[in-house]
């Protein structure tokens, strides 16, 4: 049984649209594979360290008090298809519910086209 089986992964409807646009526009055919690798890494760190490492993702500050779960942003996303290592420029925001072991991916974007995450979508 894989460690991933203990966790649920869900996405915001707009996340799926953005994900597909990045595959087509940026000609990044490995994005699906890279995203799966990110999921494995997040679960691995969570299982081994009981936290997310700050060199991969940071907690997002300044959110509404309505937000029930902590929100994180992955800043060092490795994309094989772009050949820049962790400096691909992609950002991924997600919420994590420890009680439900649920990752909810909210947004994916390129930092060169959009400098900051959409806090309205997270709220």
Predicted regions and their residues:
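Short, surface-exposed coil-to-beta transition loops
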Residues: 86-92
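Short, low-complexity Ser/Thr-rich regulatory SLiMs
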Residues: 94-98
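Basic, Lys/Arg-enriched alpha-helical interface segments
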Residues: 1-86, 99-102, 110-123
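Short glycine-/small-residue motifs
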Residues: 105
């Amino acid at each position: 049984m894989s460690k991933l089986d203990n966790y649920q992964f869900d996405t915001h409807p707009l996340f799926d649209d953005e994900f597909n646009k990045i595959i087509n526009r940026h000609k990044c055919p490995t994005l699906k594979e890279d995203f799966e690798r990110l999921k494995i890494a997040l679960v691995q760190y969570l299982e081994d360290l009981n936290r997310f490492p700050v060199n991969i993702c940071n907690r997002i500050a300044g959110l509404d008090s309505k937000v029930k779960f902590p929100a994180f942003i992955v800043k060092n996303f490795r994309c094989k298809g772009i050949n820049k290592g962790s400096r691909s420029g992609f950002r991924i925001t997600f919420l994590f519910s420890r009680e439900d072991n649920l990752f909810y991916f909210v947004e994916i974007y390129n930092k060169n086209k959009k400098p900051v995450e959409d806090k309205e979508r997270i709220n």
